[in-house]
Curated annotation (Swiss-Prot):
Its biological purpose: Catalyzes the dephosphorylation of heptose(II) of the outer membrane lipopolysaccharide core.
Record InterPro entries: His_Pase_superF_clade-1 (IPR013078), His_PPase_superfam (IPR029033), LipoPS_heptP_Pase (IPR011310)
Name under which the protein is recorded: Lipopolysaccharide core heptose(II)-phosphate phosphatase
Lineage summary: Bacteria, Pseudomonadati, Pseudomonadota, Gammaproteobacteria, Enterobacterales
GO MF annotations in UniProt: phosphatase activity
Protein's organism: Escherichia coli (strain SMS-3-5 / SECEC)
Keyword Membrane attached: no
Leader sequence segment: 1-25
Amino acid sequence: MLAFCRSSLKSKKYFIILLALAAIAGLGTHAAWSSNGLPRIDNKTLARLAQQHPVVVLFRHAERCDRSTNQCLSDKTGITVKGTQDARELGNAFSADIPDFDLYSSNTVRTIQSATWFSAGKKLTVDKRLLQCGNEIYSAIKDLQSKAPDKNIVIFTHNHCLTYIAKDKRDATFKPDYLDGLVMHVEKGKVYLDGEFVNH
């Protein structure tokens, strides 16, 4: 019982820190909460959160070639040239505040290409489990985090995965655009959704 209370207090303390950081971020972004009810977490706020817990950031892949009139990078099942530019820009901004992270993607061309352009040379691990978007994705996240408990993790996955997580964890309706993301962390074997990543 005592252990449970301590764990509960720790989780509440972390959530209070998150709220405070989101409020601070809101002073600069004009809104600490998204219209869907998720806390907005920008790069600076994410860096502060990473000092409390290693973070897990899940991104939707960049612009799909087969659903755009923009020029394809190569394979039609991959992303567009614009998508590569957007992914590189996001990666540069992200790495400026979170330089140390392990990088993963699902086993599709579009997520692999997105992660590759995001990372600018960082080692990428492809994991087919990250294509499955039910409770299975939580098991995959916990497994990846357990391999390097002190490392931040970036995962490139799919819109339906992010939509599922937001609904399941916070009953929020989240319809991610290309390269939108969610911020999570793992604590004592449980996966928590902290908020929506906002790139500023």
